[in-house]
A protein has these predicted regions:
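Primary recognition of RNase H-like, Mg2+-dependent phosphodiesterase/nuclease domains
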Residues: 1-176
Length: 176
C-alpha cells in the first residue's frame, strides 16, 4: 500500500485586468452581446489613465458572435477615425476576429467584406494594433452592450455615441 501524497498549496492566478496603453496611444475595446435574433456591438475608448474618451454602440440584426464582433471592430475603428486619433490599440475578445484583422487567417465569406473594410481602416491610422484580450479584461465593452440592449434600439446599424452625461455611469467599470 502506498502512502498518500502530500497536497501542495496552489498559487492563485493573478487577476485579469484591463491594462493601460502607453501615453500617446488610445485603447479602443470592442465587444458584442448576442440575443435571440439580434445583437449589440460596442466600442469603448480610453486614454493611458483609463479615462473613457468615447463610447459608442449599435444594434445589429444578427446574433452571430463572429459577425457581431467583426462589426464591433469595424465600429471601433470608425470611432477612432471620427475622433482623429493617430495611434490605437484595438482590443477585442474574439480571437478569430483579431487573427483576421492581423492577416493571420482568412475570414469566412459571411464577414469577409467587413474584415476587408476594417483592415483598410486600420491602415488609416499612424499606427494601429489589433490585440486579443481576455473577456475578463473586456468587461467595460460588454457592460455597454448589456446597457444598450435594455434601450430597445432599432436594427438600423447606426452607431450612437453615448452622451457624456452617461459616461460617468460607467466610470467604475472603466477601472476594471
Amino acid at each position: 500500500m502506498s502512502s498518500p501524497r502530500p497536497v501542495l498549496p496552489t498559487t492563485p492566478a493573478p487577476p485579469i485586468v484591463w491594462k493601460k496603453p502607453p501615453q500617446d496611444i488610445v485603447k479602443v475595446n470592442f465587444g458584442f452581446w448576442g440575443q435571440a435574433d439580434c445583437g449589440i456591438a460596442s466600442a469603448v475608448a480610453r486614454d493611458h489613465n483609463g479615462t473613457p474618451l468615447a463610447i459608442s454602440y449599435c444594434k445589429i440584426p444578427s446574433a452571430d458572435p463572429l459577425k457581431g464582433n467583426a462589426l464591433a471592430a469595424y465600429g471601433a475603428l470608425k470611432l477612432g477615425l471620427s475622433k482623429e486619433w493617430r495611434a490605437i490599440y484595438l482590443e477585442g475578445d474574439s480571437l478569430d476576429v483579431i487573427h483576421y484583422l492581423q492577416g493571420n487567417r482568412v475570414a469566412p465569406s459571411h464577414i469577409s467584406s467587413v474584415v476587408f473594410d476594417s483592415v483598410a481602416l486600420l491602415k488609416s491610422f499612424g499606427c494601429a494594433f489589433p490585440v486579443w484580450v481576455d473577456p475578463k479584461a473586456n468587461i467595460f465593452a460588454h457592460s455597454v452592450c448589456r446597457w444598450a440592449a435594455e434601450k430597445n434600439l432599432q436594427n438600423d446599424l447606426t452607431w450612437q455615441l453615448m452622451p457624456s452625461s452617461l459616461v460617468s455611469l460607467f466610470e467604475e467599470a472603466s477601472k476594471v
